[in-house]
């Protein structure tokens, strides 16, 4: 029994360890060896004057948003930092072929690279993931980050604009004499000169399109750190993005154009409809609502006025003038000979000369035609039916009082006046017949005055129609030219073909 137990113990001790157990033990021994005398606060420079080279790369995972109001860009990125720490090198042959280790970020020296133009005061990365250490002493750290960086917004051509936003990274604690920055390599090992985007994992933004994404290393003099005059190095990543204007075209610009068309057709609406002022004021209030909605989208700056605000203001000015001119048209339409006398130049310009050029033609007045009487002088009919028809029908006023025109009234015909007012003996008519003729003459004068009054009132209405049509064509020209001038200017505002021309 004792012999069996002894053989079992010897068998267990003689069995080789599993590969995983041996690997874990080897990594543990290697970590203990590397970090026994390691100080993470000491810069990994063999000499005091040596500089530690740190390469910085950036992988863009998502352009989350660009807040024009707060001038802030939100991005989801992966920062790629790589440097050499001579204290973390070993010979793989002496440690079971181990070529890389993964250790916590707090246990090694970090170059203290932060986003300088952050907008929320948070300089740290989103997650302190482990660093990868290779046997040559190369240390690589790829922490993810949700950054909110400041971005100066140029609002002149909003919403047909493009923006140049930057992300500035630098070592916060070391100057260029201690830490040397450079752009990191791309996946092919070449020196990277732009932000890397992985097509398979990148999430496209629905409002912005990335045009260029270069990077640049700059040197800034005059930086005092540690009580001495030094230089600071910064790696700047540029995002040159162009706005996709479809949202504003459909929801803002197209309704504004339709409202402008309503303001134009105000001048095509007849004044008797009674809705000219209501339609104009409705269009003005609608544009005011659009202006208030856009005020929350653009930055509060006095450096420039966005192009869409220019168009809204231009449209509001036109609609305001349409309200004023509608008042003028209504004033002309409701004038009468009792209140206003039409000047000669108004008659010549707006009645005789201007209408043909505006596509207006005044219809000719139609006079009542007296039908030819067909009387039968039979004993049955006699004179009764013919005289009844004659006095029932309205005679033309010019039949009794012929005039050259209605605007220069003349006295009745001299022969008729002598016929009416002449001495009874000369006329030789009975008194009853003379009274009938006098009554007919009075009614003819009243009818003529009413006809002249209506004709002059129709002249004012026709002048109002001509002025309305003149304003219609004027507004069409001004609206078309103004819209083209405002928006054609934006077509020349394109991103540069090269990021650094």
Swiss-Prot record:
Residue spans, topological domain Cytoplasmic: 333-469
Source species of the chain: Rattus norvegicus
PROSITE patterns (UniProt xref): NEUROTR_ION_CHANNEL (PS00236)
Lineage, uppermost ranks: Eukaryota, Metazoa, Chordata, Craniata, Vertebrata
SUPFAM superfamilies listed in its UniProt record: Neurotransmitter-gated ion-channel transmembrane pore, Nicotinic receptor ligand binding domain-like
Carbohydrate-modified residues: 164
Signal peptide region: 1-23
Phosphotyrosine: modified positions: 390
Residues passing through the membrane, by range: 245-269, 277-295, 311-332, 470-488
Protein name: Acetylcholine receptor subunit beta
Extracellular side, ranges: 24-244
Alphabetical GO biological process terms: acetylcholine receptor signaling pathway; behavioral response to nicotine; chemical synaptic transmission; membrane depolarization; monoatomic cation transport; monoatomic ion transmembrane transport; muscle cell development; muscle contraction
